[in-house]
Amino acid sequence: IGQCNLLEAKVVETGSERMKIEIDGVGIAETLPAAGVQAGTRGTLALRPEKIKISASLPADVADEVHFRGKVHDCLYLGDVTIYIVELENGLLVEAMLPNSASGQAKFFDDNDAVEIAWRFDAGHFLAE
């Protein structure tokens, strides 16, 4: 079925179209609301690597996106894609997948390169404990 980042989090605020969660040791993110959860509910944000953008710098003012900084911990070239393991500022490892066809390069970043990752608020799913 594929790979998935599992980020432990707590619901901070709920709403009809979005909810705010605090990803442990990382920060606040918005996601789709989950049925039956309320502020204080613990759970996991499931986020697929192909839903995560990675760049040396991303515009911070893009509506509906969540942004975090980190550095490239490792990468794995898989032909048409490269999987980057990004170490966030708190040490959490997150996998991001980047198509190699975007620029014809096999590798965009080297180990220890500073990067930003981002995903749309509706890219992940919050799974309550």
State the predicted function of each range.
Residues 1:
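Contiguous mid-protein beta-loop-alpha structural module that forms a pocket-lining wall or clamp
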Residues 4-6, 10-129:
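Non-catalytic connector elements of ABC transporters
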